[in-house]
Amino acid sequence: MTIKPVILETLPPDLDQQRLPQHVAVIMDGNGRWAKQRGMPRIMGHQRGVDSLKNLLRCCDDWGIAALTAYAFSTENWGRPLEEVEFLMTLFERVLRRELKEMMAENVRIRFVGNLTSLPRSLQDEIARSMEDTKNNTGIRFTVATNYGGRQEIVHVCQAIAREVQSGKLDPETIDEGVVEKYLYTEGLSHPDLLIRTSGELRISNFLLWQMAYAEIYVTSTLWPDFDRQAFHLALRDYQQRHRRFGKV
């Protein structure tokens, strides 16, 4: 994260600063295909994908977007080959350790959401350290969904609310959307305005099911390691051409 891209460093003139999404979420798909197309092992695609994520984070910060959430590892991803899963866990840990100083310098506030207790202990420690060290930063809010599943999150919310009702701390008649929000992993974070999915797949893959209720969805055939500022520019331009009605006329 030490060299800023010179291309599109500032907001492109055809984008309206006042109509930018304040929160962008991204499903980073296509790392394996990118590597396969080049005769490389899948893990090389994941390594290049890290660079794309770092560049997107900096781009959001440069262009005035307040929050970025990335789908790094789903609850279903444990079903991938063991070698790939172990590599990803090591990669997450190594990147966190390497980039923490830079995130502090750039005022990034990082947060991890998901079932973090199932991750390797050493990775849990790095996650806890990064969140603790950046918790008072006031710049872009960077959320990383790790061992995350939207259905699992909703089950977690139901269990938490049930315990509160059972203990007499919560009246069932008072349960509304606001109560549910308090028990989400993403509590306190605004809902995404724009979801970007790379690689052309037309599904949301169990990502932020509650939070995506009114998000605009943009799908690009670009594979994640190739997703750059120009590709992000196209996504934002498409977003600004839409009229968000939130269920109204």
From Swiss-Prot:
GO terms for biological process: polyprenol biosynthetic process. This is Isoprenyl transferase. Catalyzes the condensation of isopentenyl diphosphate (IPP) with allylic pyrophosphates generating different type of terpenoids. PANTHER family: DEHYDRODOLICHYL DIPHOSPHATE SYNTHASE 2 (PTHR10291:SF0), DEHYDRODOLICHYL DIPHOSPHATE SYNTHASE FAMILY MEMBER (PTHR10291). The gene is uppS. Belongs to the UPP synthase family. Homodimer. The keyword Methyltransferase does not apply. One of its GO terms (molecular function) is prenyltransferase activity.
